[in-house]
Amino acid sequence: MSQAITGQPVNLTASGAIYGKPAQLIGFYVNSTTAGTIILKDGGSSGTALSGTITPAVGWHFFPADFASSAYATIGGTLNVTFIFQP
């Protein structure tokens, strides 16, 4: 028997908070993009980068990551992305 991995969604089209408290990212779904990029950070816009610059294709991206204080995404280009996380 398999167990589903579930989480809470948050959609972003510009840089912003994924979640303002400690959280675990499961991954993200890119709804649409035109040269879009993502940098994931722990601790807000000036926080510690947990990734390099990601240039994702449309679709699901499994990206497990722990955010000790808060989860933030810096978005460049044109990108519509839904992050799935667990508080």
How does the language model describe each region?
Residues 13-15, 57-59, 68-70, 78:
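Tight coil/turn sites that cap or link beta-strands
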Residues 15-33:
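Short, surface-exposed binding/anchoring microloops in extracellular/periplasmic proteins
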Residues 1-21, 76-87:
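C-terminal interaction-tip segments
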Residues 47-68:
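Glycine-rich strand-loop-strand elements at beta-sheet edges
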Residues 32, 42, 75-77:
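Residues on the solvent-exposed faces and adjacent turns
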Residues 34-50, 82-86:
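Short, surface-exposed beta-strand/strand-loop-strand elements in extracellular ectodomains
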Residues 26-28, 64-78:
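Noncatalytic modules at the cell exterior or secretory-pathway interfaces
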